[in-house]
Amino acid sequence: MGCLGNQLLIAILLLSVYGIYCTQYVTVFYGVPAWRNATIPLFCATKNRDTWGTTQCLPDNGDYSELALNVTESFDAWENTVTEQAIEDVWQLFETSIKPCVKLSPLCITMRCNKSETDRWGLTKSSTTITTAAPTSAPVSEKIDMVNETSSCIAQNNCTGLEQEQMISCKFTMTGLKRDKTKEYNETWYSTDLVCEQGNSTDNESRCYMNHCNTSVIQESCDKHYWDTIRFRYCAPPGYALLRCNDTNYSGFMPKCSKVVVSSCTRMMETQTSTWFGFNGTRAENRTYIYWHGRDNRTIISLNKYYNLTMKCRRPGNKTVLPVTIMSGLVFHSQPINDRPKQAWCWFGGKWKDAIKEVKQTIVKHPRYTGTNNTDKINLTAPGGGDPEVTFMWTNCRGEFLYCKMNWFLNWVEDRDVTTQRPKERHRRNYVPCHIRQIINTWHKVGKNVYLPPREGDLTCNSTVTSLIANIDWTDGNQTSITMSAEVAELYRLELGDYKLVEITPIGLAPTDVKRYTTGGTSRNKRGVFVLGFLGFLATAGSAMGAASLTLTAQSRTLLAGIVQQQQQLLDVVKRQQELLRLTVWGTKNLQTRVTAIEKYLKDQAQLNAWGCAFRQVCHTTVPWPNASLTPDWNNDTWQEWERKVDFLEENITALLEEAQIQQEKNMYELQKLNSWDVFGNWFDLASWIKYIQYGIYVVVGVILLRIVIYIVQMLAKLRQGYRPVFSSPPSYFQXTHTQQDPALPTREGKEGDGGEGGGNSSWPWQIEYIHFLIRQLIRLLTWLFSNCRTLLSRAYQILQPILQRLSATLRRVREVLRTELTYLQYGWSYFHEAVQAGWRSATETLAGAWRDLWETLRRGGRWILAIPRRIRQGLELTLL
């Protein structure tokens, strides 16, 4: 049994030692390479800052190198804040470039248009002009018309099938600058912008309206900006970063991308606005790859740049734009028809058939595709219907929006049988006709129309086709349709879908064996050259936690230096914005970015300060680690992996750290209060003496109460033992207290103080003068206290008497000195007073004399002036005499 007890004691001791020396505590690390997803605004950087849309972007120095990270991260091109911001920002630029400012609602009136032109372009058709369709037995044209750079029809705009531009001249009457008089105006419209009523065949004019009048109020652009492409890149604010999936197998969604790189800015991109195709993209490679939506069949296909696919569009004619003043403040841009120009058109260059064939082969190999493997059954098709931007290929050419009918192009690429098509569509050509609209449907927000003033002159634009927007549908493995799409937003998912915006979280929590932070001798290191960039410390993101923790000082310094550098660049841009009268979408983003960066840094420092770890790279605390079973593998785990493991503990640890810091501050406050005892002068402070007196009174009262309690306890103990105190009164003062005894009990004999009588009564003594005794003892105690206090005060007086005498003598000497100085001051003041009085008298006499002289001079001058007429009269009298 004894051996078992010894073993149990040894086990308890070992457990106690283990609990003392093996407990782990929370340690705060600042500068760890970790991050989390973010949704804050990005800002732009560009080399070409002389265009209207990029004046407020940061200058692009091209130094945006990428660092490879040994981590695994998830990427999604559709659920992505970078692509969503790009779509919204480009839309804002698009809307700003054609921002309306003049209401054209007065033009929603009846216009008289040339009937022959309205009949020609299919707006009206009387009963006498109806023509029958061509007979089915007519020969079908299957001619393949191809054009290239050397074709003569390109320069002359007379390639086969191209017609004149569909323009109609109209007249309307309304009030002009003179509101009480009407005026007739002439205006030229595109046929697609008008809607006409069916008129009589004898009329020479058709009644037409603007086709927007039944939907909304159109406004005309009043600035000189046109929607031209803008090249720029997105950059993350300080404290944030952009991760990119560098895996060639990435197809728009990858939950575990192992090839991750980090940078502060994206690649350069262009503001594309077109349907069906993407132009001048930056993602083209020597391969064809597909971004496929994770939940439906929306795709964006990047075309192989090896095939050199191009599209060149042209709007022929020397168009003239004439502003027409409708009324005060309203100007409408008119287009007088000098001669009938050819319609706009586009032709396609490059190996398009080979490119489309490779697209089909890539679709077959894609893991999401489960349709037919026969590429002959995969067809490129046009959408069935909808808005013009869907049924036509819609693009912008230097401010003019072209709507191109793509039947000829699809027939040529797919080698279709054209015998069953309409007469005008029975051709295989590598060029397509286009028509122009001035009233367009916007691509980002539904139901809003804008009016664009046309550009003058001959317009030509050349583009490189880099992507294809399509929906891929298949049925039971028989047929697969690649239906061209009008989702303009998909272009930016291809451009930026491999990026991901993250917020750098440099504060990490991990358990260590050190309980508190101890400061040792610090050595001042020489300042080294700043080599790492703002994101340099993320290079250790794939390293183990132990290795990354060894460079926290340099990493945190790099983080702060990068924030300061980017803040200075943003500040320069904000200063330049003060000179601008009009801000683009980048103006507010730059301001938001600056505020976001400052807020993030201050937030991190405030959090560290709340834990008592401000401006420390490694901060040990007194908070025990809450989960002993969860510890990091310092040699294998990365900080990003560790942050994911302890994410559920972060809130609890944060609360414990704050509570520990509050307790630490309370302890420091109490410690600071004790520091006042180090100063000898504080001992003579009046407030301190009052405290000392209070403490003395408390001690005296405590001693008195303690003595009384001890005495009472001793007295009660002796009374319970049956002994009479030695200071009790003599027997004559005893008062017998009779008690009734049970007759059946035997009588006690031999009891001290008892006569041995065997009756039923007995008595025991009680001190009747006990109160007198207490009073005498209290008087003695008070006398002792009085004598001691008197002795203390007399000795204090004896000690303080020489000090008071010296102080009195010093005060007397000071008084004598002050009285002497006061006498000197009084004498000096009297002398100064007399001098001032003498000066005043002298100045008064001088001024009085000067005033008399001045008055005499003025009086003589006045008399002389008044005597001038008299002298003149006297002179004339002498002359006449």
Curated annotation (Swiss-Prot):
Cite the residue spans of the region called Fusion peptide: 528-548
Q: Motif YXXV motif, which positions?
A: 723-726
State the post-translational modifications.
Specific enzymatic cleavages in vivo yield mature proteins. Envelope glycoproteins are synthesized as an inactive precursor that is heavily N-glycosylated and processed likely by host cell furin in the Golgi to yield the mature SU and TM proteins. The cleavage site between SU and TM requires the minimal sequence [KR]-X-[KR]-R.
Q: Which GO terms describe its molecular function?
A: structural molecule activity
Q: Name one GO biological process term.
A: membrane fusion involved in viral entry into host cell
Q: What is the effect of changing residue 723 to C?
A: Reduced Env internalization. Mislocalization over the entire plasma membrane
Known glycosylation sites: 37, 70, 114, 148, 158, 186, 200, 204, 214, 246, 249, 280, 286, 297, 308, 318, 373, 379, 462, 478, 627, 636, 652
- Which region ranges are annotated with the description Disordered? 737-761
Q: Where is this region: V5?
A: 477-484
Q: Where is this region: Immunosuppression?
A: 591-607
From the UniProt entry, list the residue stretches annotated as the region V3.
313-345
Positions of the UniProt region annotated as V1: 113-169
Lipid attachment in record (S-palmitoyl cysteine) = 789
Q: Region annotation MPER: residue ranges? A: 673-694
**GO cellular component annotations of the record:** host cell endosome membrane; host cell plasma membrane; membrane; viral envelope; virion membrane
* Coiled-coil stretches: 636-668
Q: Which cysteines are joined by disulfide bonds?
A: 44-57, 101-222, 108-213, 113-170, 235-265, 245-257, 313-346, 397-461, 404-434
Keywords for this entry?
Apoptosis, Cleavage on pair of basic residues, Coiled coil, Disulfide bond, Fusion of virus membrane with host membrane, Glycoprotein, Host cell membrane, Host endosome, Host membrane, Host-virus interaction, Lipoprotein, Membrane, Palmitate, Signal, Transmembrane, Transmembrane helix, Viral attachment to host cell, Viral envelope protein, Viral penetration into host cytoplasm, Virion, Virus entry into host cell
Q: Where is this region: V4?
A: 404-434
Q: What does this protein do?
A: The surface protein gp120 (SU) attaches the virus to the host lymphoid cell by binding to the primary receptor CD4. This interaction induces a structural rearrangement creating a high affinity binding site for a chemokine coreceptor like CCR5. This peculiar 2 stage receptor-interaction strategy allows gp120 to maintain the highly conserved coreceptor-binding site in a cryptic conformation, protected from neutralizing antibodies. These changes are transmitted to the transmembrane protein gp41 and are thought to activate its fusogenic potential by unmasking its fusion peptide.
Domains: what does the record tell us? Some of the most genetically diverse regions of the viral genome are present in Env. They are called variable regions 1 through 5 (V1 through V5).
Q: What else is known?
A: This is a macaque isolate.
Query: What is the official name of this protein in its record?
Result: Envelope glycoprotein gp160
Q: Which organism is it from?
A: Simian immunodeficiency virus (isolate Mm251)
The organism's lineage is: Viruses, Riboviria, Pararnavirae, Artverviricota, Revtraviricetes
